[in-house]
Amino acid sequence: MATLKDQLIYNLLKEEQTPQNKITVVGVGAVGMACAISILMKDLADELALVDVIEDKLKGEMMDLQHGSLFLRTPKIVSGKDYNVTANSKLVIITAGARQQEGESRLNLVQRNVNIFKFIIPNVVKYSPNCKLLIVSNPVDILTYVAWKISGFPKNRVIGSGCNLDSARFRYLMGERLGVHPLSCHGWVLGEHGDSSVPVWSGMNVAGVSLKTLHPDLGTDKDKEQWKEVHKQVVESAYEVIKLKGYTSWAIGLSVADLAESIMKNLRRVHPVSTMIKGLYGIKDDVFLSVPCILGQNGISDLVKVTLTSEEEARLKKSADTLWGIQKELQF
């Protein structure tokens, strides 16, 4: 007896179901799911895999996304606790990690996340040996280093989301002050993601017009317009959002999808992302910090050599020293 499907559809060939543009998100917390929905809305993948250790939550999130399939162009959404669901991924995004407990030292948090990465990274590598790794978990610069060490991948394929979001926040706030869309406001925040990030005042421009040339006090303590406040707001904004809603999710999700788009579509756009910076700016240790990187199908193919002031360079070096101080204590 022919089934309804057999009566309706005449099959012409047995197809190999190997995905061509698969993306995996590890960790289905608020950040992981914001990354997932942002990627789905951009039609970047032909398959999306979700992985987590909490199976009920994982299945629920997968089903919820699958039920939106009519409105999406990603034909396959899968999930599992077992990493075999991640096989043949082009890009693997890591958002999983321990949350900082009240009063917990940064070093202690890092070590807890290292232990989590010691489980995640080898499993990812086993099933997708040629993937690019995009690290989002905090502290992102240190954990990108950890992922690089554990994976054994070449440095071009291990990328930290880094200052992509810090720079986006910076450009948004710049735009608010000037009444111009952030896309037309150019400015870069580099270095360590978070508190010790470095705004490059000399590079701020709209339509190629340097703000520093028009307003030489820009970013200094003498500045009557207090543009330094803009960077201060960038640093404080995450803490404020966390205080108000408990976590940040949407902006980082959109930021990660922006990076994923450059990688999956081989766009060769320039992003401030965390990469191995040894040998630049007088840095002699294996540390990852954000500098402008060209992102494409091989991950980071090139860096843009930014001219920094001696003060900016010193701040970058200080961040590198702080990170190395923590990294050399880590137990792998």
From Swiss-Prot:
Subcellular localization, as worded in the UniProt entry: Cytoplasm
Molecular function (Gene Ontology), one example: identical protein binding
Matching InterPro entries: L-lactate/malate_DH (IPR001557), L-lactate_DH (IPR011304), L-lactate_DH_AS (IPR018177), Lactate/malate_DH_C (IPR022383), Lactate/malate_DH_N (IPR001236), Lactate_DH/Glyco_Ohase_4_C (IPR015955), NAD(P)-bd_dom_sf (IPR036291)
Enzyme class name: oxidoreductase
Location of the active site: H193 (proton acceptor)
EC identifiers of the protein: 1.1.1.27
A biological process term (GO) from this entry: glucose catabolic process to lactate via pyruvate
Tissue: Predominantly expressed in anaerobic tissues such as skeletal muscle and liver.
List of residues that carry Phosphoserine: S310
Keyword Acetylation in record: yes
Phosphothreonine found at: T18, T309, T322
Regulation: Fermentation of pyruvate to lactate is inhibited when bound to folliculin FLCN, perhaps partly by FLCN preventing binding of cofactor NADH.
Record-linked CDD domains: LDH_1
Catalytic activity: (S)-lactate + NAD(+) = pyruvate + NADH + H(+)
Known partners and oligomeric status: Homotetramer. Interacts with PTEN upstream reading frame protein MP31. Interacts with folliculin FLCN; the interaction is direct and inhibits enzymatic activity.
Function per UniProt: Interconverts simultaneously and stereospecifically pyruvate and lactate with concomitant interconversion of NADH and NAD(+).
Name used for this protein in its record: L-lactate dehydrogenase A chain
Organism: Homo sapiens
Gene symbol of the encoding locus: LDHA
